[in-house]
Amino acid sequence: MKSIIHFSIFLLCITGPFVALSQGITEGAKVTGNIQIDGQYYTENETLGITDSSLNYRKTGMNGFANLLYTNGNFSAGMRMESYLNPMLGFDSRYEGVGVPYWFARYKTGSFEMTAGHFYEQFGSGLVLRSWENWALGYDNNLYGFNTSFSPIDGITLKGLIGIQRYFWEPYEIGNRGIVKGFDADFDLNEIFEKMADCQTRIDIGGSFVSKYEKVPKVTYVVDSKYFIDSVEWNKQTVYELKLPNNVGSWAARVNISNGGLNFYSEYAEKSNDPNATNGQIYKKGTALYSSLAYSTKGLGVFLSTKWIDNMSFKSKITETGTPPMLDINYLPAISKEHQYSLAALYPYATQPNGEFGFQGQIDYKIRKGTALGGKYGTSLTLNYSLAKSIKKDTVAISPITNSWVGTQGYKTNFLSIGDLKYYTDVNFLIDKKFSNKWKGTFGYFNQSYNKNVIEEGIYNENNMVKANIAVVDLTYRFTPSKSFRLETQGLWTKEDKGDWLSMLLEYNISPTWFFAISDEYNYGNPSDDLKIHYYNVAMGYTQNTTRFALRYGLQREGLLCVGGVCRYVPASTGLTLTITSTF
């Protein structure tokens, strides 16, 4: 309620002068928005362990939001209302409630722009700062404060910001999270220097500095020691305080070079010592490097990316942990491919901020139509490979005070070193083929290695490596331009974890209004006969103009939902789900 009042007062103060000087606030104004409501009704399922007790005696869950955006010339303002009554399964219970966690007022004049209120921002690739939101993940780390952007001359863009991060509904107080400050400068050399204006090679360089101030909690350790005086044993207790930094700074430098279909990007970042709950309270500085190379021409696309990160968890609260990770100031770009097919996405990768080497390569090739392999319509091929491994670490001696690595450098490592421990690999190959005006299909093969201990438990060994092979056949038959039928079959085979899976989906579409679907994921290879479960679902949807209703009933298997290397655990559930979306 306070957020709504604050937004209303601020909006009136900002817009008041404009109203007085114009014919009215509605002249030239535009109002847009969108709404989404996700509701669930849960039923018990003894096999999946879903009981009234596990549901906390709540039969329903509802997540919803409404965005409203007002624009008038150089001025814009917006707000988002959210409701979690109760939060759906898998979402943090601290979201429960109703309020306005996001509102802003923005004004732009010439080359200057200022935002007051809540905002999202990213410097470079996000290695030192990225504030973003993903509704499906239940993730939102928007900043509340001021954000400015200024271009003194063509080709130079300067940004500055200060704010606090959203933390569910918790109001900011000194000590419950830190204050984030940042500055970014971007230089387009082709625009700055007249001699480079017509050069085919485009060069852009930039740099960022981000810091956080946090009133950190006091952490002490008591060490007992014994000594003798006149053959009498005495005990002595010495209290040591862990000196935690109130200010933590980070910086990054980047370059982007492009020429025609060739594009190279690289960014290097460092973070000062930042002992926190994620790294085990060690004092080693953080380092990160992210680079990508892309090439595209007619019929061919190649993309390569790599990253090396060491101790780069950067939060505005040093004690914060959890999945998904809240209060992250920065973002470590994902290196693995996000798959659209459910069994291929059964084992997704989650970024490891304490140390990771990653590589991804992808080739997209279009076989020309009229050839033996291309056929009448041509054929699209995609080959993708991704790898994540540890970095080499040589641990230092433990502290005699804490009897652990707390309070030490933790370990030593060489920049760009690669360790022996494998976190994740994924090799996949997709074929997209149109056979006729009525038939088209997608055929895929995936080979994955998934270190369950590392990704899910934070245990760094290979004692629980899941190796899986997945195959996909996805066929679509179009009866008329508006009516189609789709058959999707998937198989996953592994000797580890929950064993083999088989999935099938039947979908009928009447575009653009109706869809009907029935699906089943069968865990027929589960080592436990009681858990060889059919995860069946029936669904339908209706669309009218910009409003869509979707209804689904069935079982949801447990697992991780990941977007960009950030993951949320989704528990098993059974029941009815209704989703309503609308835009205006």
Where are these regions (language model features)?
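Long, ordered, helix-rich scaffold segments
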Residues: 539-549, 554-556, 570
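Well-ordered mid-protein domain cores that form the structural environment of catalytic cofactors
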Residues: 105-127, 131, 135-148, 152
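Histidine-anchored nucleotide/phosphate-binding helix
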Residues: 64-68
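Structural motif
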Residues: 72, 107-109, 259, 544
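Bacterial Sec-dependent N-terminal signal peptides
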Residues: 1-32, 583-584
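Signature for the C-terminal beta-barrel architecture of outer-membrane proteins
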Residues: 24-30, 36, 41-61, 71, ...
